[in-house]
Regions:
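Conserved N-terminal phosphate-binding loop of PLP-dependent enzymes in the Aspartate aminotransferase
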Residues: 1-446
Length: 446
């Protein structure tokens, strides 16, 4: 693990001169469509700190978008991946297999919800996992329709763009998209017209009615939902919504898929967010936090469903790369040894407490319309004071002020008005509180 000191340090403006030089090179060489939240160039990272090429140390509240949950240089990940690199980097599992792939699939069978027989297939990215979950569901059901939800995000490939709700920046100008994708309402409690207390029952009834009347349940291969909606704004579907949708799927022979790409692997204080309401999905897609920063994803599910695709129908040249598999085994080892579920719950306790204080005590605290999320997947929704009108400008201004003071935060949400917090689960509590201090000071600049 990197021995980077776990303390914030600013020695230049953000970004510094060396980052500015690299940014000029980037503009000349990298496609303009590849964005960056903060143009500081990383030299090393670990724990809750990112150190840039100018020697600035930033507090990390982003984890590379929920990827480096165990830190960006966790000892077990580095040790296992380094050993694998020394042995071999690639054979292609479909040509000559290797134990690491099998062992990752065994760990996934142990960790994912349910005590039924399970199997997995490994890929490279979250979007690949979602695409393959659709392929598997279609092979199993012999149906074609796929149901997704308002505010959902599932990736940037053609099919997953079609499954994603938000247009800009993910979809604009990139169509037409794959057919047989249908979108229905989700129980967004903060914005549900009759109140959060009614959202679960009413939204599930409305979604089921739309599926039944507009698509036909007998035509649906899969229902796919994030148990905590990520890019859509860290929306927790109101209680009762997920169980109702899962039961409807079960009653109608539809494969229920939990997209846990952002919420999985201890991020919400449980191995998987769907466990909160006792959901046992037919298939579960994972990526991001699975491998400590290395590119790996998976589809895991009921053995009889996973086996529906014909031999050779699943896979890919790089899928389940041996170095990434070694990283995943190191990440899971770290999660278990350090009780990162427990650490995520403590992060929630600290963050929600501090955010509630800001909401109630700051002169402009009513700009925080909602505080939500679980574990180390927490967000605030920013609104025009006294209303629920989304305030994307405030979210952007807060993020910019935090960046200038050495705190990396990210925005999200269909309306662009959500500030999200995804600190590494190994972040120290002093560093966590210092980051929240910076956020509180940033509010004073609004």
């Amino acid at each position: 693990m990197s021995d980077i000191p776990q303390e914030r340090r600013l020695v230049t403006a953000i970004p510094g001169p060396k980052s500015a030089e690299l940014q000029a090179r980037r503009v000349a060489a990298v496609a303009a469509g590849v964005g960056s939240t903060l143009p500081v160039f990383t030299a090393r990272a670990g724990g809750g700190i990112i150190e840039d090429v100018d020697g600035n140390r930033l507090i990390d509240f982003g984890s590379g978008i929920a990827v480096t949950s165990v830190g960006a240089s966790a000892e077990a990940v580095v040790r296992r991946a380094s050993a694998q690199l020394a042995d071999f980097t690639h054979t292609c599992f479909m040509v000559t297999p290797y134990e690491g792939y099998v062992e990752v699939c065994e760990r996934l069978a142990e960790l994912t919800p349910g005590d039924h027989a399970k199997k997995s297939a490994l890929f490279n990215s979250g979007a690949e996992a979602v695409e393959n979950a659709v392929k598997i569901a279609r092979a199993y059901t012999k149906r074609t329709a796929v149901v997704v939800f308002d505010h959902g995000y599932h990736g940037r490939t053609n099919l997953t763009m079609g499954m994603t709700a938000k247009n800009m920046p993910y979809k604009q100008g990139f169509g037409p998209f794959a057919p047989e994708v249908y979108r229905v309402p989700v129980a967004y409690g903060y914005r549900w017209p009759t109140g959060a207390e009614n959202a679960g029952a009413e939204a599930s009834a409305q979604a089921i009615d739309e599926i039944t009347k507009q698509i036909g349940a007998e035509n649906v291969a899969a229902v796919i939902i994030e148990p905590v909606l990520g890019e859509g704004g860290f929306i927790e579907p109101a209680k009762g919504f997920l169980p109702a949708i899962a039961q409807f799927a079960k009653d109608n022979g539809i494969v229920f898929v939990a997209d846990e790409i952002q919420s999985g692997f201890c991020r919400t204080g449980q191995w998987f967010a769907c466990e909160d309401e006792g959901i046992v999905p037919d298939l579960i897609t994972t990526a991001k936090g699975i491998a400590g920063g290395l590119p790996l994803s998976a589809v895991t599910g009921r053995a009889e469903i996973m086996d529906a695709a014909h031999a050779g129908g699943l896979g890919g040249t790089y899928g389940g790369n041996p170095v990434a598999c070694a990283g995943a085994l190191g990440a899971i080892e770290t999660m278990r040894e350090l009780d990162l579920n427990g650490k995520a719950k403590r992060i929630e306790e600290v963050m929600k407490g501090r955010l509630a204080e800001m909401q109630s005590k700051l002169p402009n605290g009513d700009a925080i319309g909602d505080i939500r999320g679980r574990g180390a997947m927490i967000a605030i929704e920013l609104v025009k004071p006294g209303t629920k009108e989304p305030d994307a400008a405030a979210a952007g201004a807060l993020a910019k002020a935090c960046h200038a003071e050495g705190l990396l935060v990210l925005t999200c949400g269909t309306y662009g008005n959500v500030l999200r917090f995804l600190p590494p689960l190994v972040i120290g509590e002093d560093l966590l509180n210092e980051g929240l201090d910076i956020l509180e000071r940033a509010f004073a600049q609004l």
